[in-house]
Amino acid sequence: MTTIPLFFTFDEHYVVPALVAFHSLLAHADRQYRYRLHVLHPGISDRARRRIASVVGRFDHGEVVFHDTSMYEAELASCGGKSHFSKEIYFKLCAPTLFPECDRIICSDVDVVFTGDVSKAYFAYPDEDFYYAGVDTILPTNRLPLYASFDKEEQHWLAREICANFLLLNLKALRRDDMQRRMTEYYKANYARLPFPEQDCMAIFARGQVRPLSMRYGVSNVYYRVNADTTPFYAHCLCLPADDAARRAEFKAALADPIQLHYIGAEKPWNSCGVPKQGVWLRTLWEAGQTMYYIRCLPGILRQKWRRYSLRRFIGKLMRKIKQ
């Protein structure tokens, strides 16, 4: 039986969403394959690991392996947290050496619900030379002014970057071209000015060596707020057809039948109310048998949210005073 490897990076604060993500992934995965879920973590508790293993263990085609990354703390001491991002994202760039036994691997965030089978993505582009495959930007974005300090060539590729919430990594090609060393050095040297650190590094260094996956592998929950008949699309989008009618038809089809539903931004279905597609996440939480565990964790989840919210408000006020 072919084993499909996947890896995820998160800390103790994301254990509840990870339980939902893992249950939904395995519930919808093609059972002719085995799925090895690698968890890269900075020392999550034994209790959390046992709970994750219990959820994965309900599926005979799934297994989970834990990798403690706390040994890298000194290496990343210069990289603080960014909003709802964390240092764990750094390890998306380290997959070539973290998984020497793999030629390919899927990487996914855990603020997601899987509603379809991911296995076909693992076998995409079998005869092509590429570094990454994923879903690129679908709708117009206001992030490009954030890259004013980058040179013109870097801005060209940053405008065409793929989203890092679901990626197929061609580890063989990344190793061959020493991409891990190049990207991690750049990451650490430029962390303070990278709005989306690992995603930006991939865009700058992978350049033309990326391939589009179907939009179904990365449907953001905020897409359900737009009018699919009238919304404009991002100029450099490759995941959808160029023809407007065909593009809208495929966009609607992806919304109706996503493989991965991604909850973007700081407002998550487990820490906020009124989040688009929150009901899907809560229903999957129930199906995973983790609703009572979530309720027990909720006070800590809300404390974490408000700590980050207060920090963002403080930084915002500080920046406004500096500009006065």
Predicted regions and their residues:
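Short internal beta-strands
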Residues: R36-G43, G134
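Histidine-anchored nucleotide/phosphate-binding helix
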Residues: V15-D30
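Active-site-proximal specificity loops/subdomain of glycosyltransferases
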Residues: V55-L98
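Hydrophobic targeting segments
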Residues: P5-F8, L25, R36-V39
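A glycosyltransferase accessory/donor-loop signature
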Residues: T2-I4, F10, A164, L171, ...
